[in-house]
C-alpha cells in the first residue's frame, strides 16, 4: 500500500454521522501509515453563516415535527433538477479549489453528499479519484454523480438503489 498518497476527507455538520465517519476514516488512514490526511468541513469553511443557519434549521426540523424533517431530508430529490438548486452545485467551490491547490490530494473522500467535488472535476478536468462514503439510509440524488468513482454504502437497500439507477456493480461496496 502506498502511504504517500494524499487524502482529503470532506464532511459537514448536519447530524453527527457525517463527522463521525470522517473522524474514523482519518484515524484509520493515520493508523495505516498515511502521511498526508486532511479533514475539511467544507461548507463551514466556505460559507460559515449559511452553514450555521442551515444547521440550525436542520436541528429545528426534529423538534418541529416529522413533516418538516421529511421535507428537509427527502425533499432534496424533488428540487434536485431545478435551476434554483444549481447554487448547491457550486457551494464550497472556491474553498475546494484552495484545498486542492494546498494539499494536492490523490484521493477525495466525501462523507456528506457534496456535488461540488464531481462538478469541480467536470469543470476543471482535474481527475482526482472521488469516493462517497454514504452515511444515509436512503438514496438521495445528491450523492450520485457520474464523476464519483466509488460508493461505500451502509445498507443493501442503498446498494440496490444505486444498482437500480445504473451504477456499475464494481463501483458500489
What are these regions (language model features)?
Residues 12-21:
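A short, glycine/small-residue-rich beta-strand->loop->alpha-helix junction that serves as a flexible
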Residues 18-19, 46-47, 116-118, 139-141, ...:
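Short, well-ordered alpha-helical microsegments
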Residues 100, 104-106:
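Proline-aspartate-enriched helix->loop->beta-strand connector
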Residues 106-107, 150:
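Structural motif
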Residues 111-114:
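Short His-centered aromatic/hydrophobic patch
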Amino acid at each position: 500500500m502506498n502511504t504517500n498518497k494524499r487524502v482529503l476527507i470532506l464532511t459537514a455538520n448536519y447530524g453527527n454521522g457525517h463527522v463521525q465517519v470522517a473522524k474514523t476514516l482519518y484515524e484509520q488512514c493515520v493508523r495505516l501509515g498515511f502521511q498526508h490526511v486532511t479533514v475539511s468541513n467544507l461548507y463551514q469553511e466556505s460559507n460559515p453563516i449559511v452553514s450555521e443557519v442551515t444547521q440550525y434549521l436542520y436541528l429545528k426540523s426534529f423538534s418541529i415535527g416529522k413533516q418538516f424533517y421529511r421535507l428537509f431530508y427527502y425533499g432534496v430529490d424533488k428540487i434536485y433538477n431545478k435551476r434554483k438548486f444549481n447554487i448547491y452545485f457550486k457551494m464550497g467551490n472556491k474553498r475546494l479549489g484552495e484545498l486542492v491547490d494546498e494539499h494536492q490530494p490523490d484521493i477525495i473522500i466525501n462523507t456528506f453528499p457534496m456535488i461540488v467535488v464531481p462538478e469541480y472535476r467536470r469543470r476543471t478536468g482535474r481527475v482526482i479519484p472521488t469516493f462517497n462514503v454514504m452515511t444515509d439510509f436512503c438514496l438521495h440524488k445528491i450523492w450520485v454523480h457520474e464523476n464519483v468513482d466509488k460508493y461505500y454504502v451502509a445498507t443493501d437497500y442503498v446498494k440496490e438503489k444505486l444498482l437500480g439507477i445504473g451504477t456499475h456493480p464494481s463501483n458500489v461496496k
